[in-house]
Amino acid sequence: MDRVSNLPEEVRCHILSFLPTKHAALTSVLSKSWLNLWKFETNLDIDDSDFLHPEEGKAERDEIRQSFVEFVDGVLALQGDSPIEKFSLKCITGIHPDHVNRWICNVLQRGVSDLYLFTDFSDEDTEEDGGYRLPQEMFVSRTLVKLKLRSEHCVNWWHWDIGASLPNLKSLNIDSDLIFFGEMEKFLSSFPVLEEVHMANMEWRELDETMSSASLTKLSIHGTGVEEFEHPKSISIDTPNLLYLNYSDLVAEDYPLDDEGDVVLQFCNVVKLINGIQNIQTLYLTEDTLEVLTMCCESMPVFNNLKTLGLKSDEGRGWQAVPALLRNCPHLEFLIIEGLLHSVTDKCGDACDCISREDKGRSLISCPVKKLEVRGFRGTIREKEMIRHFLEYFPCLDEMEIDAEENDSTNFEVPRILKVVAYRLHDVVSTEIVGHWQSSAQSGGWSQTQMDEMYYELAPRNKERIYDMFFFMRRASSTVPPPPPQEMSQDYLQMQLEVADLKERQRDQEAKLADLKERLRAMLDMIVDQNPIIASALRAREATNSEREKASSGQEMTEKERDYDALFDIIVEQNPMLASAVRALRATDSERAETSSNQEMTELGQATATYFPPREGE
């Protein structure tokens, strides 16, 4: 007998609750002790894709759909009147709405608390105008605590012509093709203890909406974002206990609010929206919202309760609103920036280091942020300068966490770039560590215990602007970690600085050489196109080069090669532009060869220094 079968029935029922109902029912063939066990499940998860998968086109066959209906009916019949906690139904294969409503009513009568419905009906499936309607029993349930509704089309989620009362509902999530809501105040009043609301693809029926709820703490509204649909001219939000707001839609003309508590909304444009959320504790702003907030930099409210601020940026949007935000967050502790690169303008503000200013870093100096997380770091020069800027002007910064962009071509030598930043920034650097937080266990990596111990040893201290920096690199890496902190001398840091500078200069030089060569090639192509004789000479040279490759390296130049070189020299002398281009191109190739040779010698010297240390007395 296997060990699982010897477990108590309560434990085995709990294990089955994590499986789809169809898979749980299949365990009845294992033994007699499993025969009826699945019938006592309090969590039912029924998914028609599990039942009809994997044969393509199977869902179109009437007998298969009928067998699915019989399966669900059989499961519910076997359980009888036993209590049920959670019922999840995914049904998008053309099942008639009457069957779906019968199943919903069954679990409602048995006291279901969590109900998740993912349904989709065609026009042929629904006989009523306005699409599928949920059973009336669902709107008067006294046991529902969580309700999640999702559909693609032809579903009318709410009955406006009947009364509704769900006294224990705390979480409501509706994601539909279109949600036509009107009389929002009446809608929310049906849920006296509602705490979380999420609505996606929402279209407003009324031009003036009021959302009032004393219990609501989390509100997410995602409109259609299509101008052709109706959008409210005014949204009034009366939610004194609201802690989280996610609003994504075209901006309404007005956002009045009647509440006199913690949140006060009194605005007639976008400025009012930001004023109305000034008492929140966590705020995340997308790149679009960040750009819109440039309109209210001068009237930015003070966020006295804000602890966490997240900003998403891209290269096409500016940072005009960032300085005002940072100056008006007197208790900010955690700052998240997703994407350091942004559009550089003269109104960019002093939060970045893009333009030299006399009042550089003023908004950062007044910001008390303790932890900074940078996401999507690519290792570019601009990003490196931004990191330097933050380290220099955030006075209370204790911890910086950098998430490097995976597999980005510009993300090179990120650990050494951070070494350069920290070393150049401060006159005194006691210890600076760059750690690799590996996404998977790899040879040579640090364990979690080692990371925790090292972090404990390197407690940041800022009183005398002496920093112990600890950077987390959230990326897979096979790089051998740096030595322990007690072995990291100033000489080691200086060596890492020099190596990083050398590699950075080499990359800049290679980029300049590549650009110069591309321009010279373009110039030569233009000259060749305008001079047929030169084109013939170049073709002859290509043929000669091909013959040279076939010949041995010690063979002397043939008479044909000497004649060609003489002809080419004559053509070059007659065309000064071509002569200059050829000389520059040859100089470029020579310089590249010299650089490559110097690099090889440097690497050889490092290798010999590692494996053959100097003897005593040398």
Curated annotation (Swiss-Prot):
TM helices/strands, residue ranges: none
Lineage: Eukaryota, Viridiplantae, Streptophyta, Embryophyta, Tracheophyta
Protein name: F-box/LRR-repeat protein At3g58940
Taxonomy, superkingdom: Eukaryota
UniProt biased composition (Polar residues): 595-609
Keywords: Leucine-rich repeat, Repeat
LRR repeat start-end pairs: 147-176, 196-223, 224-249, 282-313, 314-339, 354-379
Chain intervals for the UniProt region annotation (Disordered): 587-618
Domain F-box: 1-47
A Pfam family recorded for this sequence: LRR_At5g56370
SMART domains: FBD
